[in-house]
Amino acid sequence: MSKTHLTEQKFSDFALHPQVVEALEKKGFYNCTPIQALALPLTLAGRDVAGQAQTGTGKTMAFLTSTFHYLLSHPAIDDRKVNQPRALIMAPTRELAVQIHADAEPLAQVTGLKLGLAYGGDGYDKQLKVLESGVDILIGTTGRLIDYAKQNHINLGAIQVVVLDEADRMYDLGFIKDIRWLFRRMPPAAQRLNMLFSATLSYRVRELAFEQMNNAEYVEVEPEQKTGHRIKEELFYPSNEEKMRLLQTLIEEEWPDRAIIFANTKHRCEDIWGHLAADGHRVGLLTGDVAQKKRLRILDEFTRGDLDILVATDVAARGLHIPAVTHVFNYDLPDDCEDYVHRIGRTGRAGASGHSISLACEEYALNLPAIESYIGHSIPVSKYNPEALMTDLPKPLRLTRSRPGNGPRRAGAPRNRRRSG
């Protein structure tokens, strides 16, 4: 982890429970990020927090640290039953829930607090078995949480801490009714520590905070610019016919260590995957159609470096923290300006630098003015020589539902650069 994004504030400076500090230091966490330095004094004083920070700024560890400290410092309610968790962390996607659970495990190992995971797609009985033995902190998506609650596998009457992560995305995905259903089954807001984190604190997110929290304090960490000053942005104007060849040429030129390619539809993602897999790249596909176990396996392979390129839709990739992403390619300019910020926020994280390359084709170039207005600057334009684009491309593979991760290639060096001046 780069230290350039850290503050002088140390976790040990706070009156944190000693086991929490021990767990953090075992993971090499000594200094706070800005959002952690702002949020922790409030949560340690028992104040509710609604936090906004750019992606990759340590929001997850801010609310996990607060949650573990609170549970260790406050007794559970009298006569708490085995099906009553003490803390509930809600996430918009199953991948994000799994990721939060993984980030919480080192804290759980030191403190002895038990974790549970609840998400749709698969693993129903496996997740239920863990819940039946009793958990302190339950992390999950709203649909599976409601399912378990309706069947009385969980009871929310003993909740002491609530976290809502990626609250803006909860709205985008239509989960607000589910969230309100869950809140109605908990003790009143004044009897809980409530935390909400979001990439944007829009009016609707603030309305939710007012409705479900107890006089929340708003904390914001604004970047120098919405897209992050460590991210180099670049824009090309390809024709529809040259777009795929330009992408593959750029990949050969840049030879990224770890890249994510975004497209606006799952069908476009599948097409990109097919071209890159046929050309021998180690590439994975992350869309809503990919089975849950494969999604988790592909994410793990990409995180470990067994895959070099991940092709993804916005919904599938939102909220995921994958370290050391060097490049983001916007094969399609997104229809939503905020999605542009979220996409390129996959790179340039935690003090590192990154490179974002966008292709403004005939189909999606109309999205560019709104994006540039939203981020507050023009994206630098680069030109390319159409005659220098790759032509020796194999026929794309057709996706088989058994393997959306492919390719042995990662030997040798990149080919000569093909851009015009």
From Swiss-Prot:
SMART domains: DEXDc, HELICc. GO terms for cellular component: cytosol. It catalyses: ATP + H2O = ADP + phosphate + H(+). The keyword Cytoplasm applies. A motif (Q motif) lies at residues 9-37. Residues 40-219 form the Helicase ATP-binding domain. A motif (DEAD box) lies at residues 165-168. CDD domains: DEADc, SF2_C_DEAD. One of its GO terms (molecular function) is RNA helicase activity. One of its GO terms (biological process) is RNA catabolic process. Pfam families: DEAD (PF00270), Helicase_C (PF00271). Its EC number is 3.6.4.13. Keywords: ATP-binding, Cytoplasm, Helicase, Hydrolase, Nucleotide-binding, RNA-binding. Residues 402-414 have a biased composition (Low complexity). ATP binds at A53, Q54, T55, G56, T57, G58, K59, T60. Residues 396-421 are annotated as: Disordered. It is found in: Cytoplasm. PROSITE patterns: DEAD_ATP_HELICASE, HELICASE_ATP_BIND_1, HELICASE_CTER, Q_MOTIF. PANTHER family: ATP-DEPENDENT RNA HELICASE RHLB, ATP-DEPENDENT RNA HELICASE RHLE-RELATED. Component of the RNA degradosome, which is a multiprotein complex involved in RNA processing and mRNA degradation. DEAD-box RNA helicase involved in RNA degradation. Has RNA-dependent ATPase activity and unwinds double-stranded RNA. This is ATP-dependent RNA helicase RhlB.
